[in-house]
Each structure stands twice: as C-alpha cells, then as structure tokens.
Amino acid sequence: MQAKNMKKGKSGALGKRDWVIAARKLLVRRGIAGVRVEPLAKAMGVTTGSFYWHFSGRQELYDALLQDWHDTNTAPLYEAVKAAGSDPRRQYLAFFGVWVLERNFDPGYDQAIRDWARISKKVADDLREIDGRRIQLLTRVFENFGYSGLPAEMRARVTYYHQVGYYAMHVKEPRERRLELAPYYAEILTGHPWMHALHSVDGIRAGMLGDVSFEDNWTGLEEVTSARPFSESVRSGSRPT
C-alpha cells in the first residue's frame, strides 16, 4: 500500500528522498529517538520492507538526514551571500534574510540537530564543523565591512551566537517586530547605523530579498580601521560615524 499523503515519484513509488523528508519531520517533532523505521513506515503508509529497499539500516538514514540538513539549512546561506555581490550591506541583509524570513531555512530543524548532537559524537562533530563554517562566512562579511582579524571574527561570533540563542530560547516575536528591530541589531553588530537608511519594515524586507541598491560605495568604517585598535576605541568611548 502506498502513502496517501506523500508525493510520489514519476513511477508512482516512494523514493529515498521521501523517506528523508518524512524522517526530517519526525526529527523536528519527536527528536532522534522518534526517528525509527516502524513509525516512519506507518506515517508514510508503507511496509518496513520499503525502507530496506532504499536503506541498509537506520544509520544510513541518519547519514542522509545530516546531509539533508547541510543542503537545506547551510547551503542557502552561502548562496544568498554570494548572490549579494561585494557590498557588505547587501551581504549582511542576504544572510539575515535567510534567517529572519526563513527562506530555505528551518530553525526547528537546526534546533533538532543540536538536540541530537547532545547524544551523538558524530552529529556533534558535524554540527561543530557547520557552525564553524557559518561563522567563517559571517567573518568574511564583517571583513568586508572593514574589520580584520579578531574584531571581524568576534563580531561574527556574537552575531551567530545571538541568533542561535534566539532559537534555543524559543523567543516568540512577530516577524514584523524582528524586521523593525533589525536596524538596531545591525548598528550594534556592524558598528554603523547604515540599515536605518532603509527607513521601513518593507524596505528592510525588500533588502533581505535582494531588492535594494545603495547609491554610495561602502566606506563607513574607514576611519575605524585606519585609526586605532577596536579595544582602544571602546575604552575612549568613541564610535564609528
């Protein structure tokens, strides 16, 4: 018996991808302990024999699930930043557009992987690598803003840890409110009030979707990076202009 609620391939049979999608839903809803062959088969309306046609066992499904997470929750961040071009403001907006607008990104999936990592060294190692890659991507964005070395990396870490904490704490905040606050976060994180120039929630949303152009080339941090170290600026109470 074929599943009534799953999209079938051209042949009418459920494929390997269908199993991974079903496993993803179970992982988010019940945790890794709930991702078992019998519940999956029942949810899909097929026998367990269908599972073993595509997978040698649960570990192969788990490996496919991790790869799916890479593809759906990390690759879009790289693609968005690459498509944004060289302007760091557009890169920043693109990165946060994936997060805030949840474009090809499922925060529940990320959190489920983090929960899984608590009991699996393999998943923990994989998660650590992906977290590192995402932070490296953000570091490059901050380098394009004009920071270098540790200042760029620390801003990237604070930005990333802030967002991960937002999800981990299950903060309930309307998307419109998040967009409204975005310029204030951006000013703190990038050291410059550039996003306020987008004027409205609609303007910020459009910017996150790539529909924005800046009349000037980015030079906002030249005074900061060419003058004294960031730590000295903090001690003196100065800020970028």
Language-model regions: role of each:
Residues 78, 96-97, 114-115, 139, ...:
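Amphipathic alpha-helical segments within well-ordered protein domains
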Residues 55, 101, 113-119:
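Short helix-capping/turn signature of helix-turn-helix
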Residues 1-14, 196-241:
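N-terminal intrinsically disordered/low-complexity leader segments
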Residues 67-74:
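Short, basic, alpha-helical segments at the C-terminal edge of helix-turn-helix-like DNA-binding modules
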Residues 78-109, 159:
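Hydrophobic alpha-helical connector segments
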Residues 145-207:
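Hydrophobic/aromatic-rich alpha-helical bundle segments in the mid-to-C-terminal region
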Residues 18, 25-64:
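Helix-turn-helix
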Residues 106-111, 121-146, 151-158:
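Amphipathic alpha-helical packing segments from all-alpha helical-bundle domains
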